[in-house]
A protein has these predicted regions:
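Flexible, glycine/small-residue-enriched loop-and-beta-strand segment within the central core
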Residues: 3-89, 115-117, 121-124
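A generic "structured core" feature
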Residues: 35, 73, 77, 93-101, ...
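Extended beta-solenoid/beta-helix repeat architectures
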Residues: 89-91, 106
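Acidic, glycine-centered active-site loop in nucleotide-sugar glycosyltransferases
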Residues: 107-108, 113-116
Length: 124
């Protein structure tokens, strides 16, 4: 289920597993693939970014965009307002706290919160 409004760049780069729920007002920039595992819940206002731009300002002037895939495992819960940055992998059975900014991979069975998101505990 995807609740409107929903925003994406292309749509063809988004892969959803069975029984995925995407709440309202989410933005998925899918220049690279976005893969969301089965039974995952995405809260409202979540943003998933695959595009990455060079840090060097001269290179950034070139009309190029690089994209790195974002992967979310099965049975995850991504809290409202979370931001997932290019190239991150979130393992299976993870919880990402509301408003968190995920800049690095999160291992299976983790609860991660904050900006940048850090693992604060494991879940069974």
């Amino acid at each position: 289920v995807i609740c409107p409004p929903f925003y994406c760049d292309h749509g063809h780069g988004i892969r959803l597993g069975e029984h995925v729920f995407v709440n309202a007002n989410c933005t998925f920039l899918d220049g690279g693939y976005i893969t969301i595992g089965a039974h995952t819940l995405i809260g409202p206002n979540v943003q998933i970014y695959t595009p990455h731009h060079p840090v060097d300002y001269i290179t950034r002037r070139e009309p190029k965009e690089y994209a790195y895939p974002v992967t979310i495992g099965e049975d995850c819960w991504i809290g409202g307002g979370a931001i997932l940055c290019p190239g991150v992998k979130i393992g299976h059975r993870c919880i990402i706290g509301a408003g968190s900014v995920v800049t690095k991979d999160i291992p299976d069975n983790s609860v991660a919160v904050g900006n940048p998101a850090k693992v604060i505990r494991k879940v069974d």
